[in-house]
Amino acid sequence: MFKGVLFDLDGVITDTAEFHYRAWKKLGDEIGIPLDRSFNEQLKGVSREDSLTLLLAHGKKEEQFSKTEFLELAKRKNDYYLEMIQSITPKDVFPGILELLKDLRANNIKIALASASKNGPFLLAKMGLESYFDAIADPAKVANGKPAPDIFLLAAKEIGLTPRDCIGIEDAKAGIAAI
């Protein structure tokens, strides 16, 4: 019997993928790297910095930006994304998720967020779900992003369980590989 559930966020609890796509596309347009939906699939479930690395490689511009400029680009993308997600509300929670969280709570199952999104706490708060989570694994504290299992291992640790005692819920290829 499992004792914990480790949730991804985007594509599992709500869908902010379109906001990510639009923010990456806007940044890509600004730096001369066209971004289409097909390429965007590679960015799902991947950290912001790793996504930017993929985008720059896609545009053959990985050597054109200093570390400082790279970090500024990552921040700019996130600023676009944050502006777009201000409109998220509890109505944006996928059907069945709230009921699942309530059932898990009622059965004393620990719940953690294992998302590459550094905006996870903000999004959970906007949707009114933060009180259901025992822990939110901070992606800044892991050495490797998905598809490495680091974020799921940290989430399990933060709820005091071994990975074998947990179920991971994911939608992206990188996240499924991480589980």
Region roles according to the model:
Residues M1-E41:
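Active-site neighborhood of HAD-like aspartate-dependent phosphohydrolases
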Residues I33-L35, K61, L129, G160-L161:
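Helix N-cap/coil-helix junction residues
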Residues P34, H58-P95:
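Metal-dependent phosphoesterase signature
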Residues E83-L113:
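Short, acidic loop-to-helix structural element flanking the phosphoryl-transfer center
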Residues P90-K91, A114, K118-I169, K173-A177:
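Substrate-recognition "cap/lid" segment bordering the active-site pocket of phosphatases
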